[in-house]
Amino acid sequence: VPSGIAQMTAFLDEHPDYSTAQGHYLTFTPHKGKISFYPRYIRYFDKQVTGDTPRERLLQEKNMYASLLYSVIRTQAFQRMYAACFNPDGSLRFRNLFLAEEFFNHAALIFGKYATLPYFYSARERIRGSATETTVPVSVIKTSHKYREEYQGFLLALSELLAAREGDTLEDAF
């Protein structure tokens, strides 16, 4: 894993127009003294999002799900993305794990291009009863009145980043 991370940072050093990169993932599940391994995000093993503008990259990324939350990302971009998760009073704009993953996917692409590189990068344990099994799906967050405020916070955070990056008004970005 450390050598995979080193490959990502070297790639980002050589490609200043990219904001993030990651390698290949495995998911593992211990069961009765054995461990089962499964490749993750296999359909994105050679994925790149290379649009020249934030809007082009967001359109190119549409329906891609390979979480960039766990990628290597430029420090300044991550700091700005993280700061956008909070309201001026310090409260969180959204709390849902899947919404946070979607936010980081979109936000990372606002700051630059993305690449999946051919290096082993991470192994994640699939834990029965973990947040991935108990968190409200994004499809519900987007459509349920109960989560309207949280979804609006998500949209506002992305709109602010997009407006700042493209020099648009908040209304144009929203």
Label for each model-derived stretch:
Residues 1-143:
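Nucleotide-sugar donor-binding/catalytic module of glycosyltransferases
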